[in-house]
Amino acid sequence: AAPGSSPHQVYNITWEVTNGDRETVWAISGNHPLWTWWPVLTPDLCMLALHGPPHWGLEYQAPYSSPPGPPCCSGSGGSSPGCSRDCNEPLTSLTPRCNTAWNRLKLDQVTHKSSEGFYVCPGSHRPREAKSCGGPDSFYCASWGCETTGRAYWKPSSSWDYITVDNNLTTNQAVQVCKDNKWCNPLAIQFTNAGRQVTSWITGHYWGLRLYVSGQDPGLTFGIRLKYQNLGPRVPIGPNPVLADQLSFPLPNPLPKPAKSPPVSNSTPTMISPSPTPTQPPPAGTGDRLLNLVQGAYQALNLTNPDKTQECWLCLVSGPPYYEGVAVLGTYSNHTSAPTNCSVASQHKLTLSEVTGRGLCIGTVPKTHQALCNTTLKTNKGSYYLVAPAGTTWACNTGLTPCLSATVLNRTTDYCVLVELWPRVTYHPPSYVYSQFEKSYRHKR
């Protein structure tokens, strides 16, 4: 998770695939907690060649450009305007490139052919002993044995690399897309178990890809990185809203002015009574609300222990933690996609040591905290969210959160209890308060 946040907090996450110049050429976004969403990335092979090496024919094409070059002809008559070749002619694997529909068809043939294909070599995250693999100039594939994935007859693989790369379309599917003059060589990049364990995707990782053809194998480099954005409301920098919200003491109502004596008249007087003007009570300010909290605590104490309220002091604490959690039972809601409040960071801080009572627990609760649990639920596998009912929140060993990610619960040792948050009000007998005042008035002789 982001520093200081709950691992269950939902962010807008974007996985980006970059070219050799580290420009974004393909991206996919979704709302998920960090390190729980590992989609299949499907950029086209030719997208990686945008602004790339001259071999691919796209060195002057910017990222997100449309497929260049003339389309294929529909037949020997050449009915498509501006077409260059009949795409039904026999293909050769010579010059598989990206600059025309005809050459993209050749590239499709190379990447799917059992005797040809492509292979991928990792960049700087490879083991230190792989010194002979070279750098980006050799596409990290300077010698055989550097490849960790790809689609080639020897089936390159690895137990430690972060991704696997394959074709995302069959050759028959790709042929039709190529004839429609579109990008037609999409890849399927999947994260391995090793790749799902690392959290360095924000800075990015890089690979090289080379075609396996006769002669020198042409290649390119590409990268994968993650970006995330907080979806919660931004807190403005400015005056303390609590101070601004406090209301001043109401001024006393002015005394009514004495009525003037009416002039003497021979006419019959008519009694006119003024209509009362309704007055709206002023809205409660922060001070009123805080006082109401203390009054509520007093009423609860007076009902349960009336002898304690004959003379006492009830105080709101002036230092953290300002709240206590009371474990409760409740019915949470289950959502397949993250609701809006899952992206809001909690404004309160609380640890499980400040929770009392017995309530609903979720996860693998250790023996040290099982006293908080009246009922303990296990989560099923899957990607879904458990939202606390209104007026409650989840108190977890990682902090407070309005909703839980089942993915996070299942891949970590996180455990949570459903709680209500109550302000901390301390009780002091009069002797304690008087002693504090006496200390402040004593002076050393």
From Swiss-Prot:
Disulfide bonds join C46-C98, C72-C87, C73-C83, C121-C141, C133-C146, C178-C184, C312-C315, C342-C396, C361-C373, C403-C416. Pfam families: TLV_coat (PF00429). GO terms for cellular component: host cell plasma membrane; membrane; viral envelope; virion membrane. Glycans are attached at residues 12, 168, 266, 268, 273, 275, 277, 279, 302, 304, 309, 334, 341, 374, 410. Keywords: Disulfide bond, Fusion of virus membrane with host cell membrane, Fusion of virus membrane with host membrane, Glycoprotein, Host cell membrane, Host membrane, Host-virus interaction, Membrane, Metal-binding, Viral attachment to host cell, Viral envelope protein, Viral penetration into host cytoplasm, Virion, Virus entry into host cell, Zinc. Residues 275-284 have a biased composition (Pro residues). GO terms for biological process: fusion of virus membrane with host plasma membrane; symbiont entry into host cell; virion attachment to host cell. The keyword Isomerase does not apply. InterPro entries: FMuLV_rcpt-bd, TLV/ENV_coat_polyprotein. Zn(2+) binds at H55, D86. Specific enzymatic cleavages in vivo yield mature proteins. Envelope glycoproteins are synthesized as an inactive precursor that is N-glycosylated and processed likely by host cell furin or by a furin-like protease in the Golgi to yield the mature SU and TM proteins. The cleavage site between SU and TM requires the minimal sequence [KR]-X-[KR]-R. It comes from the Viruses. Residues 253-286 are annotated as: Disordered. A motif (CXXC) lies at residues 312-315. Residues 1-445 are extracellular. Residues 262-274 have a biased composition (Low complexity). GO terms for molecular function: metal ion binding. The mature envelope protein (Env) consists of a trimer of SU-TM heterodimers attached by a labile interchain disulfide bond. The surface protein (SU) attaches the virus to the host cell by binding to its receptor. This interaction triggers the refolding of the transmembrane protein (TM) and is thought to activate its fusogenic potential by unmasking its fusion peptide. Fusion occurs at the host cell plasma membrane. This is Envelope glycoprotein.
